[in-house]
């Protein structure tokens, strides 16, 4: 039996904080890095071409492992969801695991944008487990959490 697994990683959808409540020291540093360097390394046009390509393929399961976003902003998650939507139609064929940039800082209102936009592809537990039709087992671990301003770890 043939089984095609597609794995995408480090898409880094990026945007700059629009509202004062989204700014903090860590996001300020991240936005400066984005402006000076990262936006050139992670052009959004590349992500759209990637989605187009994968849309034309005959795949059995799609895994997207973080980082979906650069600064963990809601508008980044919104854009990622909108762009990836053609690939997300069959939820039982998609698994998405967050990365450290997806849990970049503690949201002042206690919201988790990853969960808001992509939890249905991971679940509520720290460990995501799925039995794939080919007999493989897919296990994803969400070890990410907001880290202090001086740390990029999650």
Functional labels for PLM-detected ranges:
Residues 1-77:
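N-terminal active-site segment of His-dependent metallophosphoesterases
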Residues 78-154:
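Extended active-site neighborhood of metal-dependent phosphoesterases/phosphodiesterases
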């Amino acid at each position: 039996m043939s089984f095609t697994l597609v794995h995408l990683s480090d898409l880094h959808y990026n945007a700059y904080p629009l509202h004062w409540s989204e700014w903090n020291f860590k996001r300020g540093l991240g936005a400066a890095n984005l402006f000076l360097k990262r936006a050139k390394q992670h052009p959004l046009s590349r992500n759209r071409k990637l989605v187009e390509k994968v849309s034309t393929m005959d795949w059995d399961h799609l895994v997207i492992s973080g980082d979906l976003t650069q600064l963990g902003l809601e508008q980044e998650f919104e854009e990622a969801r909108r762009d990836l939507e053609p690939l997300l139609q069959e939820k039982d064929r998609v698994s998405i695991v967050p990365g450290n940039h997806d849990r970049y800082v503690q949201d002042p209102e206690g919201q988790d944008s990853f969960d808001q936009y992509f939890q249905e592809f991971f679940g509520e537990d720290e460990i995501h487990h799925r039995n794939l039709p080919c007999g493989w087992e897919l296990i994803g671990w969400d070890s990410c959490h907001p880290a202090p301003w001086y740390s990029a770890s999650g």
